[in-house]
């Protein structure tokens, strides 16, 4: 290998190492800060806003209103747990059984990829990372998930998740969603309304709260049944999530 190529390789290696250190400090600081402070915006919100501007859509506004857990209907927290991650109170960020099932399904159905991300993983991804699928992003997501599971309580993870989740075009967080779709604060959401909001979370840009498809309605009904089977509001109290 020539001296010039060695020099370039050495420069790139030093640059990447420094970048990793900077990102680690940035993300570590974010995890520490947002363990107590409201989250003003997420990486997904920034990505959506910048993408809209780049496409000439200057009317798009990524909107979110932070609210504490006691300003959110307990039905909403229960609905997303029932829909997205029923083992949320028990695991340390990863549902191994669900991951194994998803991998087996994806091997059989390459055109219909199934995910197995927990609420903790989705929170880490939405807050700190870019959208998309890659092993690099998945690796970073795993590290960030362990970080927030170590520093934050389960109640804090759920609070942040509900405040940054995307519920529609430009609609981020349960307070903005409740105001947009039901003209009421998040604290007043009913069990059925909470289940409908949770029903669009797999793909909120495809599935619409304002005009729910038959699939969304059937998923809403399934979520309502799961909420009942989990035990209703006492489930949230039992796990200190309310």
UniProtKB/Swiss-Prot annotation:
Subunit structure comment from the entry: Interacts with FtsI, FtsW and FtsN.
Pfam families xrefs: Transgly
Membrane topology: Single-pass membrane protein
pH dependence (UniProt free text): Optimum pH is 6.0-6.5.
Lineage: Bacteria, Pseudomonadati, Pseudomonadota, Gammaproteobacteria, Enterobacterales
Gene this protein is translated from: mtgA
Organism: Escherichia coli (strain K12)
UniProt catalytic activity: [GlcNAc-(1->4)-Mur2Ac(oyl-L-Ala-gamma-D-Glu-L-Lys-D-Ala-D-Ala)](n)-di-trans,octa-cis-undecaprenyl diphosphate + beta-D-GlcNAc-(1->4)-Mur2Ac(oyl-L-Ala-gamma-D-Glu-L-Lys-D-Ala-D-Ala)-di-trans,octa-cis-undecaprenyl diphosphate = [GlcNAc-(1->4)-Mur2Ac(oyl-L-Ala-gamma-D-Glu-L-Lys-D-Ala-D-Ala)](n+1)-di-trans,octa-cis-undecaprenyl diphosphate + di-trans,octa-cis-undecaprenyl diphosphate + H(+)
Biological processes per GO annotation: cell wall organization; Gram-negative-bacterium-type cell wall biogenesis; peptidoglycan biosynthetic process; regulation of cell shape
Annotated protein name in UniProt: Biosynthetic peptidoglycan transglycosylase
Pathway linked to the protein: Cell wall biogenesis; peptidoglycan biosynthesis
Regions crossing the membrane: 19-39
